[in-house]
Amino acid sequence: MKFISQMVHNFAKKYAADTMQKSLYNSLRIDITQENIAKIPNPDKKYMLYMHVPFCHTFCPYCSFHKYAYERGACKAYFSALRTEMQRTKDAGYDFETLYVGGGTTLIDEEELARTLELAKSLFSIKEVSCESDPNHIEPESLLRFRGLIDRLSVGVQSFDDDILRKASRYDKFGSGEILREKVSRAVGILPILSLDLIFNFPFQTREILLRDIEAAKAVNPEQITLYPLMKSPLMRDQIARSLGVSNVDNEEEFYSIICKEFSSWHRSNAWAFAREKSNINDEYVGTN
């Protein structure tokens, strides 16, 4: 009976995943047209601006986000194009109260990012800015220049476990779990909110490893901790299997239950994010606008 129940459970999860993938394909499909169509902003609607910085020095084996190898000239040209696009968006009548900057490595060129954020704040009615970062771009002297520009910085630590860091090609790039703890500890308190991001359900991750990661994350005292399940997209599935291995057991549901229990006294911002204090900063940065 338990075997049949597990089969039904697995089938339901696969059906849900397939249905979601088809829905996304239909929603995001872009048809080529020769018509000059301008989308007019709805004055009764609040819009969020998303800015993507697609450059990285090296790539993580599980990451399926749009990215390119960093080249200084291309990066500066890209930021210049971003600023031009923002001006055109302003001229089209759009306004934004929130801005989310994702990547890639968003702070890969601090001067260009600061200049772009300053322009965004001058063009639009932006009240809050959230930005992602990796552990190599959170030195206090770097973050100080972003006071007044970034309200929440999400730092992708992913794990403090050295074995996971090695298999995920992050140990040599960002340092050991101990070094990561030191880096994040120095960064806490510089900007209004620092969110420490972890990944759970690695193929070889155990319950004990997850609990140690949670304990280490809480110990550095960030304002928010976010825990995402490992996203095994079809695009990256083979790469994940080669670098991280393959598990015949899916612990995502069990691990998520552990996470909810461990953060039961924290404020839940969304399904994955937990804050020490309740915040008004928007955590839902992907929508159908």
What are these regions (language model features)?
Residues D91-F96, S265-R268:
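Surface-exposed helix-capping loop/turn segments at secondary-structure junctions
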Residues L49-M51, V155:
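Short beta-strand motif preference
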Residues L244-N289:
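A C-terminal junction/extension of Radical SAM enzymes
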Residues M48, P61, G102:
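Divalent metal-dependent hydrolysis catalytic cores, especially in the metallo-beta-lactamase
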Residues K67-K90, E97-I259:
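Conserved non-cysteine loop/helix-boundary elements of the Radical SAM core domain that shape
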Residues P41-P43, P54, G93:
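Short, flexible hinge/linker loops that cap or flank conserved catalytic cores
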Residues M51-K67:
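Local cysteine-cluster metal-coordination motifs and their immediate loop/turn environment
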Residues M1-L49, T58:
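Flexible, acidic/Gly-rich N-terminal and inter-domain linker regions that tether
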